């Protein structure tokens, strides 16, 4: 048996063998008795036979994803340094007993540092929260610059929201639920993690089998060692490329977690819902990352993902580094030099010397600089985009999508870059790509046009984009054309497309509650929740929906889902309690106030509903839906002047807001202002989408 070179991996061995406080008091309960009683960490048992793989892994970022505090590694950042962040001063010191301390002037508390995330280019230190979970302060240690910094120092989200800080009590404040490690980080920084949240006590009792992303996160354990001594059952040792990719995607994706029971070999879509470009500010309308979006969405939206390219085509599974260098384009040329067939598609043959207008050997001549530009995560961690778009300066000027040309040519503008692109690639910009980007851009800006979206859908063959366009169509005023497109999509082979179709179809999607994939069943179930409550045949669907909501109940979205379930089941008191709980978890959530207001309005409590809608418009003054709903409630209260003002504000924020214009026209008609009402209806007809009235 080959021996592991312990001196080369000693730090990782020590990390595996150390048993942190979280594991002592919160034992992992999801493992078989054999592994729970094992005295030697499983990954070290793997190393006995798989020496090379273990040593490769020991030097990877996966191995260092989570660990306990180590005085030798962590003393430098805790020598009295100070950092001003979000109205508070943070001070980092070391106690006499050797504990690392974080002092927060805002809460006037000293926190003992519990554990550590990552190792480069930044390190995050976790502290214990009041809810039994761990929290990630907004301060992180820059390994290269050797200093503390605020991870939100250049956060576009804060500027979009009109705020410069994350205040105490906010969901996104570091002591809030948005920065709770157990809910937001732990699945991807430990192996075999279980959240174990107790909603009644509002406390976490989480557990994990091993710190970091270890062997057992990517290789499925057998119930006991096999006859050959291997810890992985013979039938589980060979996985398909898609199964391995789905395992990577559980962490390298911006996604909604439906449960924490994923094991290697499962489908991603049975446990997670992938985030698509359907919410403003999250992705650019061409699918490029705008926020911290990770890799999976971009890849699923790309032609390469459509062809069958997966993570392991480019990345080594154990070192987690690239298989070939990117600097000389050898990684990309591995396929694009000879037209390698991936799946059933031949890669386009590319000659780097003639393909780019940039000089050979320059930074701009690297494939990744144009097709995978970097964006900063946590302010100082540059990560590459995986949507594999081509620079289109014309679209950049029109829609704001990133223009990679200007990353190097900072003294130039979009017009200059557009001229270069037009000269070099006179006929290579696909009309379909531009039409789709414009359609998504208009929809995200609240100016969606049904015909534009339908045309883009009809021309699209990438499943991720088909799902995106259907999701955006589901938010439009429904027409027979939309319904026909959604009915056809119900039979699509891709689960994301079927789930999007369910959201557009409503009651017609009821048969999809029996779909083999969870994201589809879940989408169809929410559209038919009242049917589920009253149908014994739908008991399984209702139980699954309830389990998802309970799993997410530590977050405001989960509380709102529980509220809707309780409401559908006629439990008004429970529903109201959950709406209030959602607001307490995120006092700045416009959606929570809005949904609560709708709930109250339907129970003939218009004054209470009015107060919640005023709260909604206060926290989200740029949200047209909020002012629209406010206008409906004011009209119900016969405050017609104020109602018109609210509807006007909604239309000012979104001139193509069909429902707002329709209801304004109806209100003007009610007030006897017929010419003004007729003018509004003419404007509405010009939008070419017949409206339907909406009640609050």
Regions found by a protein language model. Name each.
Residues 495, 518, 556-557, 590-591, ...:
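Helix-start (N-cap) detector for alpha-helical repeat units in TPR-like alpha-solenoids
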Residues 476, 492, 515, 551, ...:
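Structural marker of alpha-solenoid helical repeat scaffolds
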Residues 22-33, 44, 52-118, 122-130, ...:
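Primarily the internal scaffold of c-type cytochrome electron-transfer domains
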Residues 466, 498, 521-522:
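Residue-level detector of extended alpha-helical repeat arrays and alpha-solenoid scaffolds
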Residues 479-480, 535-546, 569-581, 602-615, ...:
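Structural signature of tandem alpha-helical TPR/SEL1-like repeats
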Residues 447-457, 478-490, 505-514, 534-547, ...:
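Amphipathic alpha-helical scaffolding segments comprising HEAT/armadillo-like alpha-solenoid repeats
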């Amino acid at each position: 048996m080959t021996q592991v070179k312990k001196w080369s991996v000693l730090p990782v061995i020590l990390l595996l063998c150390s048993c942190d406080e979280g594991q002592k008091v919160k034992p992992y309960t999801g493992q078989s008795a054999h592994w729970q009683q094992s005295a030697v960490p499983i990954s070290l048992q793997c190393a006995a036979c798989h020496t090379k793989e273990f040593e490769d892994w020991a030097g990877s970022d996966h191995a260092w994803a989570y660990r306990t505090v180590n005085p030798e590694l962590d003393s430098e950042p805790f020598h009295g340094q100070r950092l001003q962040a979000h109205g508070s001063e943070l001070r980092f010191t070391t106690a006499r007993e050797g504990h690392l301390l974080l002092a927060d002037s805002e809460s006037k508390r000293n926190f003992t540092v519990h554990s550590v995330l990552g190792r480069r280019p930044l390190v995050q230190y976790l502290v214990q929260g009041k809810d039994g979970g761990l929290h990630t302060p907004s301060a992180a240690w820059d390994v290269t610059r050797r200093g503390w910094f605020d991870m939100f120092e250049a956060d576009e989200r804060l500027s979009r929201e009109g705020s410069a800080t994350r205040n105490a009590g906010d969901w996104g404040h570091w002591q809030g639920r948005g920065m709770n490690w157990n809910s937001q980080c732990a699945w991807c920084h430990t192996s075999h993690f279980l959240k174990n949240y107790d909603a009644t006590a509002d406390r976490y009792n989480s557990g994990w089998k091993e710190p970091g992303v270890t062997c057992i996160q990517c290789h499925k354990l057998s119930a006991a060692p096999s006859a050959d001594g291997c810890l992985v059952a013979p039938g589980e040792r060979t996985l398909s490329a898609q199964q391995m990719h789905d395992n990577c995607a559980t962490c390298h994706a911006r996604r909604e977690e439906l449960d924490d029971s994923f094991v290697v070999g499962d489908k991603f879509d049975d446990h997670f819902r992938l985030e698509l470009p359907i919410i403003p500010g999250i992705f650019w309308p061409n699918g490029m990352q705008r926020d911290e979006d990770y890799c999976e969405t971009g890849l699923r939206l790309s032609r390469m993902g459509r062809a069958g390219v997966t993570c392991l085509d480019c990345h080594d599974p154990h070192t987690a580094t690239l298989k070939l260098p990117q600097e000389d384009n050898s990684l990309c040329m591995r396929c694009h030099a000879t037209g390698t067939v991936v799946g059933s598609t031949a890669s386009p043959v590319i000659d780097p010397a003639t393909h780019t207008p940039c000089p050979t050997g320059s930074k701009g001549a690297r494939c990744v600089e144009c097709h995978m530009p970097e964006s900063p995560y946590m302010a100082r961690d540059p990560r590459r985009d995986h949507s594999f778009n081509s620079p289109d300066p014309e679209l950049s000027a029109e829609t704001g999508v990133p223009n990679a040309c200007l990353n190097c040519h900072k003294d130039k503008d979009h017009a200059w870059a557009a001229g270069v692109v037009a000269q070099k690639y006179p006929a290579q910009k696909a009309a379909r790509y531009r039409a789709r980007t414009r359609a998504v851009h208009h929809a995200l800006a609240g100016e969606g046009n049904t015909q534009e979206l339908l045309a883009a859908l009809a021309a699209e063959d990438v499943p991720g984009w088909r799902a995106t366009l259907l999701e955006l169509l589901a938010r439009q005023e429904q027409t027979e054309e939309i319904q026909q497109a959604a009915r056809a999509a119900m039979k699509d082979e891709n689960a994301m497309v079927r789930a999007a179709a369910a959201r557009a179809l409503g009651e017609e999607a009821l048969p999809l509650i029996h779909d083999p994939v969870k994201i589809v069943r879940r989408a169809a179930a929410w559209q038919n929740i009242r049917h589920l409550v009253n149908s014994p045949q739908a008991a399984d669907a209702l139980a699954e929906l309830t389990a998802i909501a309970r799993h997410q109940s530590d977050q405001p979205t989960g509380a709102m889902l529980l509220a809707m379930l309780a409401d559908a089941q006629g439990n008004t008191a429970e529903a109201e309690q959950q709406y209030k709980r959602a607001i307490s978890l995120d006092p700045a959530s416009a959606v929570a106030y809005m949904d609560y207001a709708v709930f109250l309005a339907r129970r003939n409590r218009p004054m209470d509903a009015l107060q919640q809608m005023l709260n909604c418009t206060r926290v989200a003054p740029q949200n047209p839906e909020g002012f629209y709903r406010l206008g409906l409630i004011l009209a119900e209260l016969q405050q017609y002047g104020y109602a018109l003002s609210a509807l006007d504000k909604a239309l000012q924020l979104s001139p193509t807001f069909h429902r707002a214009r329709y209801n304004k026209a109806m209100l003007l008609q009610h007030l006897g202002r017929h010419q003004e009402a007729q003018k509004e209806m003419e404007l509405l007809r010009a939008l070419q989408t017949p409206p339907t009235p909406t009640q609050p």
